[in-house]
C-alpha cells in the first residue's frame, strides 16, 4: 500500500514539474501549439473531441480535459447550468427584463442551458488544472486565458488566437438541412440559420395568394392558434382540420408552414390560415418595434449595473465565472432581447387580429412558445401542451424534462400519449384535471401490415447520439462510445450476412455515421431524412441507441427491439427499458444478444409480445390521436 501511495505522489510531483501547460481548445490554434510544444517542456491538454481527434491523428501526446472531472462533477455542472439559467427570476433585476409583460430573460433559457453547460464545464476543468499545476505557465486561446486569469497569474495567449471561438451562439451556428430536386433525383446540403431565415421570408410572401382563406374568416368563429407544427409530420391532424367547425391558424416562425408540394397540399386541404411576418408587418408595427427596441436598450444598461448580483449568481461550487462570462453574456442577451421585441410585437398583433379560443404548442422551452404562454395568460386564453416525444418518465429525469419543455409547468392542459406519462405527471404533482391522455397524431398511420411485416429485409439501426446540452454527452468517452457502438453494429451485421440500414436522428447536431459505415461495409445504407416508420415496417430487427421514440414505433409495428446503451446521463431507467419490451444491452453483450434475437424465434416473439403490451401502456387511442385531439379542442372552446 505504501509503495502505491509513493507512486501516486511521484506521479503528482512529475505533473507539477511541467514548465508549460498548453490548453488546446480550438484547431485553429494548431500551428501555435506546434511551435510552442517544440521549444519547451510542456504538457498538452485538449478540451473537446475535435482537438483530441486532430492531436491523435498527428500522434501528438496529450491528455483530455475530461480526465480532471468525475461523474459527480459532471452531474454538478449540469445541475448548476439548470439553476443559473433561471437568473431571470431574481427580484432584483425583474423590472429591467420585462417587455409588454413578457420576461425577456426567460426566452433565452433553452439556448442558455446549452451555452452554460459547455462554459461551466470548461471553467471547472481549468480550475482543476490550475490546482494540479500550480508552478506551471498556462498557454492557450483567448477563450481559455480569459477564464484562467481567475485562477493563475502565469498565462500566455497563443499569438494568432481568435476570440470568435467562444462567441458562436448555438441557434445562430446551427446548420439547417435543405433538399432540392425531386424524389429520385435530389441532393441535400446544409445552410446557415441566417440564410435559411431569409429564404423562409421570401418563400412566405406568396402565401396570401396561394391560400385564399387567409384573411377571409368569420368574426365570431372559434379559432385555435397552432404554433410550430410541421404539416407533413402531423399529416393526419392537418387532414382532419377541414372536417371540424374550428378554424386553425398556423404560426411557424422557426420553420416555413409549407416548403414542397406535399406540405402545400396538406395546408390547402386543411382549410387552415397561415400567418407570417409578411402578413402581419406594416409601417405602424415597424414604428412600435423600433420604439420598443429603444426602450429595452436603456433597460439593459440598468440591468447589467447590478454587478454584485451577477457575480454571485453566475457561479459554480463557490467559484464565480462572471468576470470572464460578462462581456459575452451582455452582448448575447442584448442581441436576443432586441430580436425578441419584434417577435413579441408580431405575436401580439396576431392575437389582436383573431380571438383565439385556445393555443396549441409542442414544448414550453422554445422562445416563441414562451411568448405565447405569457401573452395568453394576459388574455386568459388556455394553452394546451401536446406531448411530442417519448420522455424519461423518471424522477431523476425531471430537471432534464423541464429544461426540454415537456413538463406542463405553465400550460393549462397537458395532452399526453397514454397511461404511463399520465401517471408520471400525477407523481410530479400535476393536477389530474390538467392531464388528458389522448394518444398522438403522428402514430395514427403507424399500424401493423401483414404484407410489409413479412419482408424482414434488413436490420435497422436508429441513432440518437450525444447532445451539446448535457455535460456527460460532451465527454470524449461518450462521443467515442457512440461511434464505437455504430461501428460494432456495422461489424456484427456484416459478420452475420445481414443487410443494415442506418437511420440518423433528425437533430441538426446528430453525427452522420456514413464514414464509419463505409470503413466496415460499403453496402451499408445511411438515411438522414424522412419518416422512420416505413423503414421499421420492413425490417427484421430494430436496434435503437439508448431510449428513443422509435422504440414505440417498433412496438406498434410488431418488430423486436434491442436498446443499445451508450450514454450515461443519470436520468434513471424509464418503464420501456424495464418492462422487457426491448432487449437492453451494451457493447460487451451485443454480439451474444444480437445472435439470440436473430436466431431464436422464441426470444424474438416474446420481445414482440412484450412490445405490443408496452405500446398499449404508452399510447392510448392508437390510430385515432388526431380525432381525439380535435375533439378535445372542440370541447375546450
Tell what function each PLM region has.
Residues 1-637:
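Catalytic-core helical/loop segments in enzymes performing group transfer/polymerization on anionic/lipid-linked
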Amino acid at each position: 500500500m505504501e509503495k502505491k501511495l509513493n507512486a501516486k505522489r511521484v506521479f503528482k510531483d512529475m505533473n507539477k514539474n511541467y514548465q508549460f501547460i498548453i490548453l488546446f481548445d480550438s484547431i485553429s490554434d494548431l500551428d501555435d501549439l506546434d511551435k510552442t510544444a517544440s521549444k519547451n517542456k510542456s504538457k498538452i491538454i485538449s478540451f473537446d473531441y475535435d482537438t483530441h481527434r486532430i492531436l491523435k491523428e498527428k500522434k501528438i501526446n496529450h491528455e483530455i480535459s475530461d480526465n480532471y472531472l468525475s461523474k459527480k462533477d459532471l452531474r454538478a455542472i449540469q445541475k448548476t447550468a439548470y439553476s443559473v439559467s433561471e437568473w431571470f427570476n431574481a427580484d432584483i433585476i425583474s423590472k429591467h427584463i420585462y417587455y409588454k409583460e413578457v420576461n425577456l430573460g426567460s426566452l433565452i433559457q433553452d439556448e442558455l442551458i446549452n451555452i452554460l453547460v459547455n462554459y461551466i464545464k470548461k471553467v471547472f476543468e481549468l480550475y482543476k488544472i490550475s490546482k494540479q499545476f500550480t508552478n506551471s505557465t498556462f498557454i492557450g486561446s483567448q477563450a481559455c486565458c480569459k477564464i484562467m486569469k481567475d485562477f493563475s497569474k502565469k498565462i500566455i495567449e497563443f499569438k494568432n488566437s481568435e476570440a470568435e471561438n467562444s462567441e458562436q451562439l448555438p441557434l445562430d451556428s446551427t446548420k439547417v438541412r435543405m433538399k432540392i430536386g425531386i424524389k429520385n433525383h435530389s441532393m441535400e446540403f446544409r445552410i446557415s440559420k441566417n440564410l435559411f431565415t431569409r429564404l423562409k421570408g421570401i418563400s412566405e410572401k406568396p402565401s396570401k395568394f396561394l391560400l385564399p382563406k387567409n384573411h377571409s374568416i368569420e368574426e365570431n368563429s372559434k379559432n385555435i392558434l397552432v404554433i410550430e407544427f410541421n404539416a407533413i409530420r402531423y399529416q393526419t391532424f392537418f387532414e382532419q382540420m377541414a372536417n371540424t367547425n374550428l378554424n386553425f391558424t398556423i404560426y411557424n416562425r422557426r420553420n416555413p408552414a409549407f416548403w414542397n408540394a406535399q406540405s402545400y397540399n396538406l395546408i390547402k386541404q386543411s382549410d387552415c390560415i397561415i400567418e407570417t411576418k409578411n402578413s402581419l408587418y406594416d409601417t405602424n408595427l415597424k414604428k412600435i418595434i423600433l420604439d420598443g427596441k429603444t426602450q429595452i436598450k436603456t433597460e439593459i444598461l440598468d440591468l447589467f449595473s447590478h454587478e454584485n448580483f451577477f457575480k454571485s449568481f453566475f457561479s459554480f461550487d463557490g467559484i464565480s465565472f462572471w468576470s470572464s462570462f460578462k462581456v459575452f453574456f451582455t452582448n448575447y442577451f442584448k442581441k436576443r432581447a432586441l430580436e425578441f421585441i419584434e417577435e413579441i410585437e408580431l405575436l401580439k398583433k396576431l392575437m389582436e387580429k383573431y380571438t383565439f379560443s385556445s393555443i396549441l404548442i409542442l414544448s414550453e422551452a422554445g422562445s416563441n412558445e414562451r411568448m405565447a404562454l405569457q401573452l395568453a395568460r394576459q388574455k386568459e386564453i388556455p394553452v394546451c401542451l401536446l406531448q411530442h416525444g417519448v420522455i424519461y418518465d423518471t424522477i431523476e429525469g425531471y430537471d432534464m424534462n423541464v429544461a426540454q419543455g415537456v413538463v406542463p409547468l405553465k400550460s393549462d392542459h397537458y395532452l399526453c400519449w397514454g397511461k404511463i406519462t399520465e401517471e408520471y405527471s400525477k407523481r410530479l404533482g400535476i393536477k389530474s384535471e390538467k392531464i388528458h391522455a389522448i394518444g398522438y397524431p403522428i402514430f395514427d398511420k403507424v399500424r401493423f401490415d401483414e404484407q410489409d411485416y413479412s419482408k424482414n429485409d434488413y436490420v435497422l439501426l436508429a441513432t440518437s447520439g450525444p447532445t451539446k446540452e448535457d455535460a456527460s454527452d460532451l465527454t470524449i468517452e461518450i462521443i467515442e462510445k457512440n461511434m464505437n457502438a455504430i461501428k460494432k453494429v456495422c461489424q456484427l451485421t456484416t459478420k452475420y450476412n445481414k443487410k443494415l440500414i442506418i437511420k440518423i436522428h433528425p437533430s441538426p447536431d446528430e453525427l452522420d455515421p456514413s464514414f464509419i459505415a463505409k470503413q466496415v461495409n460499403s453496402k451499408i445504407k445511411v438515411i438522414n431524412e424522412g419518416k422512420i416508420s416505413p423503414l421499421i415496417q420492413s425490417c427484421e430487427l430494430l436496434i435503437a441507441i439508448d431510449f428513443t421514440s422509435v422504440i414505440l414505433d417498433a412496438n406498434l409495428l410488431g418488430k423486436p427491439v434491442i436498446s443499445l446503451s451508450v450514454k450515461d446521463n443519470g436520468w434513471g431507467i424509464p418503464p420501456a427499458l424495464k418492462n422487457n419490451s426491448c432487449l437492453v444491452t451494451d457493447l460487451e453483450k451485443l454480439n451474444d444478444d444480437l445472435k439470440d434475437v436473430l436466431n431464436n424465434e422464441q426470444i424474438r416473439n416474446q420481445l414482440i409480445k412484450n412490445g405490443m403490451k408496452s405500446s398499449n401502456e404508452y399510447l392510448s387511442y392508437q390510430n385515432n390521436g388526431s380525432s381525439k385531439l380535435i375533439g378535445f379542442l372542440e370541447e375546450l372552446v
